[in-house]
Amino acid sequence: MKKTIISLSFILLCGAASAQGFDAGLLFSENDYQGTARTMAMGNAFTALGGDLGSIGINPAGSAVARCYQFTITPGLDFSLNGTKGSVTPDGMSSFQNKVYNGRTRFALPNLGISLDFNTGRRRGVMNWSLGFVINNTAQYNSSPLAMGTNKNTSAFGQMAARAQDLAEDGYFTAADLFDDSVYDKLAIEDWRVVTGFRSGAIAQNGSSGKEFIGISEYTDESGKIKLGQNGIRQTYGETTSGYKTDYIINAGMNISDIVYLGINLGAVRLRHKSDSYIQEEAVDPEDFDIVFTDNETGGKTVTHFISAKNTFSSSTSGNGVYGKFGIIVTPYRGLRIGAAIQTPTMMFMASTYGVSSTAKYDLNAYSGYEEVESATSHYQLRTPMRANFGIAWTFGGYGLISADYELSDYSGIRYFENKN
């Protein structure tokens, strides 16, 4: 079960982190080994064991342990259950009182493989060697958190307006500039929401300076202070993530005197990751929000009321890479097994696309609006770090075994490279 805790003070940034950030680099570098039913039942602690096609991605030497032909196919289901609950704000008020659970189930194929074994007929030295091809899942991206509740203290679109004001004061634009598409080129992707929000009416110019903004869910009282409605706003946050990371492995193994087992992998990685997230705010009582629009030509004023607003962010990332891996298993004493493997860094060739949209609804539909923008595909390289696997196991004849594994990877070695083309 995946448990997600969300604080709505920061939720407007939902999904807005670029796929070229450290969090994404870590996500795409980590391995959540899957494999066959046998290896998963052992928690994939197979570095020192081998003998199963699900273990080849962990230690290539494992293919030489099983002195027979093998074919495996492992279907599965991937379950995701997300639970969300709000936290108490500094003033003692809880905006999201109830727990919300949301689940998602997907079919998966953790392992598919074949291995051929060739006996040399010798009693010592190279007694047999193997050749195999294995497909192993190393990550499943599957989550769908959902959070909702009533908030009288903070507004996501108020925060969007505050961000627009900060950018305007830093000289990136004035309100008039936000109608020019070139403004997107000046901003980071996570700030595109400011442009779509302004064009849709989710935020608006406040005053005449062109550098002050107000959110659709806010109003200015008689003293000039910006406030939320007395009855607050209903907020909803949702996110759906899907995708996978799969290794396609060509393997060769060798058994030396039933004591030393060697193996080597040439691996290709295929990655797909898609995320769609949104935050929506609705007025509990639209009469709390008197929104005044002023006609720039006539000076006439029109009063309408805020109904709802929604901001969405989507990202789609794909990648392909290659790596090499070498492994060894040694059986120095009957029952004792020691294994180790080392994998080269993986150079991933990545492509990412992002989309942002904003919607604003007023009770006078003439003032409602929608705006969306999608980025061109960006191409770059991601180098994931080298990793090493160590394992030790003890077998009790045909009665059972104990196995322990340790994987070492220096994630500070994650690097991005710009595409020269």
State where each predicted segment sits.
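Outer-membrane beta-barrel porins/channels
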Residues: 20-34, 39, 117-421
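Outer-membrane beta-barrel translocator/receptor signature
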Residues: 37, 49-58, 64-151, 246
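Active-site-proximal flexible loops/turns
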Residues: 9, 66, 272-274
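Bacterial Sec-dependent N-terminal signal peptides
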Residues: 1-23
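Hydrophobic alpha-helical membrane-insertion segments
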Residues: 11-12, 68, 407, 414
